[in-house]
Amino acid sequence: MPELPEVEVTRRGIEPYVAGRRVERVDVRTPALRWPIPPGFARLLHGRLVRKVERRGKYLLFEIDEGWFIVHLGMTGTLRVLRNVPHPPAAAKHDHVDWIFDDFILRFRDPRRFGAVLWHPRSAGDVLDHPLLADLGVEPFAPSFSGALLHRKTRGRKVSVKQALLAGEIVVGVGNIYASESLFRAGIRPTTPAGRISLVRYDLLADAVRVTLAAAIEKGGSTLRDFVGSNGESGYFQLDYFVYDRAGQPCRVCGTPIKQIVQGQRSTYYCPTCQR
């Protein structure tokens, strides 16, 4: 599943193309995604100017005068910029939505159809008040994200620290891959109850989350199965993993074999020596 780095890589790749440009047409081939694309969506966007593209958690927010259309990549979704000159590229089976501009197409592809294309009218208030966005945690690169925040929000909680990161109620966008990698950098075992971790160790974890996500964005995200950036290129951060998907391989720091366990039906990877 695309996590925060992959969504941010997509946003950075798309915005220079679409910001300040008008949508000439929208082709909706598959309205039945995770949630149905609203009727009249294509007509609503016809001729509209895209002001900017922002990100909240794993959601992409495209602003036009009348509101915002929201895109979530789901498990296998991608957004690609494709040149339509001299001929528009043919759509394949899993290409569900095209936003057509004068000299390129923004194409949403999603083989498993767990992604979403939604509409939030300006009359309904700010886009951050949308039901899917209103209760999200703090952004990991925001000044308000800190070890003190993690420490305060987890007091009395028995859930594991990894599950607390994944929940998205405290901090957004830290999915399975980057939770495992961040906990390794901080030297914290993922099974540790969140409420038992000290402020000092949470300071280390907050720094580790930021460093890990920034490094992943710099490498274009991770490509394990489906993800490609807006230009169709794969990410390369998976080559730098310390623990994720490395079960049985030696730790890059101490040489101890990486251990794999299951938490909440998801695989967790850690070093039994480096992480306490």
Curated annotation (Swiss-Prot):
The keyword Transmembrane helix does not apply. It comes from the Bacteria. Its EC number is 3.2.2.23, 4.2.99.18. GO terms for molecular function: 8-oxo-7,8-dihydroguanine DNA N-glycosylase activity; class I DNA-(apurinic or apyrimidinic site) endonuclease activity; damaged DNA binding; zinc ion binding. A zinc finger (FPG-type) spans 242-276. Keywords: DNA damage, DNA repair, DNA-binding, Glycosidase, Hydrolase, Lyase, Metal-binding, Multifunctional enzyme, Zinc, Zinc-finger. DNA binds at residues 94, 112, 157. Monomer. This is Formamidopyrimidine-DNA glycosylase. It comes from Paraburkholderia phymatum (strain DSM 17167 / CIP 108236 / LMG 21445 / STM815) (Burkholderia phymatum).
